[in-house]
């Protein structure tokens, strides 16, 4: 009798633990963040293709798309472009681009976007006309409110000197943010010295014209928009009960996948205080942006790694980044076929590398683990909705 009682207690404990695990997974808030980096967007594009392929296999659904699994998808610069590609609906209300169409998009359009240089000292390096044309052709008249999941795309208004964050959740309060996706994409990619700033207008809540004068989102949020994406997810908690689990920044209830576009710890050349002591504006201008982007991305990753680990949820955060780019792969505007092929190889090789010195798990294994969590969570929510 005692043995039977002990056995029943054990079963109850197992069921309770299992139930708690699944409940926790069901409540997870999922966030995807994609860095800026111009043509280097090929690297996260390669990673996204792998991830979406895994989700399709796990769910036995060739039509499965990343927007079906993430509550918030955020990006800046080329990351904003990728965000739009995988969240903007087509005529069937599905993402107009599958993940395996991202890299071919760069190969087809990259050489034309980064072409027709107009001279870097007396104007932007590129006129941006082809970029705007291809965005209009692919994104059409779609606006922010039509995105298939919550988005977080950053830009910076040089007239008001304030960052502008385009999200669905802000539209009720600020309808002027319901801009056309092609205007948003061009704006977040309009890196100073590379492309001209972008001017366009929308309507305010009173029907008045509201004007934007925007440049690259990296000016507002640095190249890594992970913190921005988290803040948008957190704000959703104030309005949607489904996000209640992160109202107090409970990172145990959040899955964050952050994709970088690659950096190098050496910047191709190192410098000493002595040799830079007499540098002027031009010398610093040639290297400071790369240094700043790399340093800020490192600090964002350091902060997120620390807070997730502090809540014993380090497995919930995955930063996929190549830190050893060399040669032309470090350039954001080298759209030669040879360099683009090299960037694809960087992405594919990255999948085989360990996540860190302390974590022998490869990025491929980590992404498969993430895919399993995303798949299971989607099924749990679908089952709950059917009752």
Swiss-Prot record:
Q: Does the keyword Ribonucleoprotein apply?
A: no
Segments crossing the lipid bilayer: none
The cross-references to InterPro entries, in alphabetical order and at most eight, read: Acyl_Trfase/lysoPLipase, PNPLA_dom
Q: Where is this motif: DGA/G?
A: 216-218
Return the Pfam families for the record: Patatin (PF01734)
Q: Where is the signal peptide?
A: 1-23
| Keyword list, A-Z | Coiled coil, Glycoprotein, Hydrolase, Lipid degradation, Lipid metabolism, Plant defense, Signal, Storage protein, Vacuole
Q: Which superkingdom, per the lineage?
A: Eukaryota
Which part of the chain is the PNPLA domain? 32-230
Q: Record's Gene Ontology CC terms?
A: vacuole
Q: Provide any one GO MF term from the record.
A: nutrient reservoir activity
Q: Which tissue types show expression of this protein? A: Tuber.
User: Which residues does the annotation flag as glycosylated?
Assistant: 115
Record motif GXSXG, residues:
75-79
Q: Which positions are tagged coiled coil?
A: 361-385
Residues at the catalytic site: 77, 216
The record's EC number reads 3.1.1.-
Entry's localization field: Vacuole
The biological processes this protein is annotated with in GO are: defense response; lipid catabolic process
Where would I look for the motif GXGXXG in this sequence? 36-41
Function description? Probable lipolytic acyl hydrolase (LAH), an activity which is thought to be involved in the response of tubers to pathogens.
What UniProt notes about the protein's domains is:
The nitrogen atoms of the two glycine residues in the GGXR motif define the oxyanion hole, and stabilize the oxyanion that forms during the nucleophilic attack by the catalytic serine during substrate cleavage.
Q: Which family does it belong to?
A: Belongs to the patatin family.
Additional notes on this entry: Patatin have a dual role as a somatic storage protein and as an enzyme involved in host resistance.
Q: By its UniProt entry, which PANTHER family does this protein fall under? A: PATATIN GROUP D-2, XYLOSE ISOMERASE
User: What protein am I looking at?
Assistant: Patatin-08
């Amino acid at each position: 009798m005692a043995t039977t009682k002990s056995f029943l207690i054990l079963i109850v404990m197992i069921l309770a633990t299992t139930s708690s695990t699944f409940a926790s997974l069901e409540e997870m808030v999922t966030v995807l963040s994609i860095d800026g980096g111009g043509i280097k967007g090929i690297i996260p594009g390669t990673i996204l293709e792998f991830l979406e392929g895994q989700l399709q296999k796990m769910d036995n659904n060739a039509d499965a798309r990343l927007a079906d699994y993430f509550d918030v998808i955020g990006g800046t610069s080329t990351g904003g472009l990728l965000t739009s590609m995988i969240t903007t609906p087509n005529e069937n209300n599905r993402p107009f681009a599958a993940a395996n169409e991202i890299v071919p998009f760069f190969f087809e359009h990259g050489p034309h976007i980064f072409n027709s240089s107009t001279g870097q000292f007396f104007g932007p390096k590129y006129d941006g006309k082809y970029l705007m044309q291809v965005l209009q052709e692919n994104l059409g008249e779609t606006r922010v409110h039509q995105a298939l999941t919550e988005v977080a795309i950053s830009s910076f208004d040089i007239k008001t000197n304030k960052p502008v964050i385009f999200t669905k959740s802000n539209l009720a309060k600020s309808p002027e943010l319901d801009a056309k996706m092609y205007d948003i994409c061009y704006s977040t990619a309009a890196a100073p010295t590379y492309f001209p700033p972008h001017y366009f207008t929308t309507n305010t809540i009173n029907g008045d014209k509201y004007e934007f004068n925007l440049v690259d989102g990296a000016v507002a949020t640095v190249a890594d928009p992970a913190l921005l994406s988290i803040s948008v997810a957190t704000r959703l908690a104030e309005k949607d009960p489904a996000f209640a689990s992160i109202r107090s920044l409970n990172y145990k209830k959040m899955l964050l996948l952050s994709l970088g576009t690659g950096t190098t710890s050496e910047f191709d050349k190192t410098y000493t205080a002595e040799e830079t002591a007499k540098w002027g504006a031009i010398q610093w201008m040639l290297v400071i942006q790369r240094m700043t982007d790399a340093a800020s991305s490192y600090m964002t990753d350091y902060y997120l790694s620390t807070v997730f680990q502090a809540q014993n949820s380090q497995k919930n955060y995955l930063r996929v980044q190549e830190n050893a780019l060399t040669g032309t792969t470090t350039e954001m505007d080298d759209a030669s076929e040879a360099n683009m092929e090299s960037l694809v190889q960087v992405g594919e090789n990255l999948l085989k590398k360990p996540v860190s010195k302390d974590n022998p798990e490869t990025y491929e294994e980590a992404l498969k683990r993430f895919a399993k969590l995303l798949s299971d969570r989607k099924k749990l929510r679908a089952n709950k909705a059917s009752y």
